[in-house]
Amino acid sequence: MRIEVESLTEAGKPFAHTYRPEEIALDEEEHARLTGPATVQGSARRRGEEIRLRGKIGAEVEVSCDRCLAAVRLPLEVEFDTAFIPQAAEAVKTENVELLSADMGLAAYEDDAVDLDELVREQILLALPSRRLCREECKGLCPVCGADLNAGECACEPGGTDPRWSALADWKDKSRKS
């Protein structure tokens, strides 16, 4: 969705859009995808060349559990407040090395329109928790055979150590005896 800069005033103009899951490609490395429509609504204001967007995004995202890789659905409600400046003005600002706190919420627009799609995608990804678990007591996968330990115990011997660590274990035993 594009918001035309020329149509905006200081009083503000409301906007709303519903994205289909295939319209927003989330990060494949994050193993995240939309499971249904994502809605965005808010208002856009213009003060000089600066455009300020404030609003809310609602979506449901499916991610993989960090321990057992099971699919986990996360409902997200994200509020945003972002200022946009023209691409040319942003190029002038980036000549300074120091980033001021006032510049932290700045993004750039070009061609006299603000592209809302990338903002929505970024805000959804930023709202994802850093630790994604199917449940707090998730046992994860067996490091030897890969069995899901939530479904039951596997046949692997507990306490087995990797043979690559045997030299360190020998050194530890020798240092205890000395």
Set out the residue ranges of the language-model regions.
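Structured interface patches
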Residues: 1-178
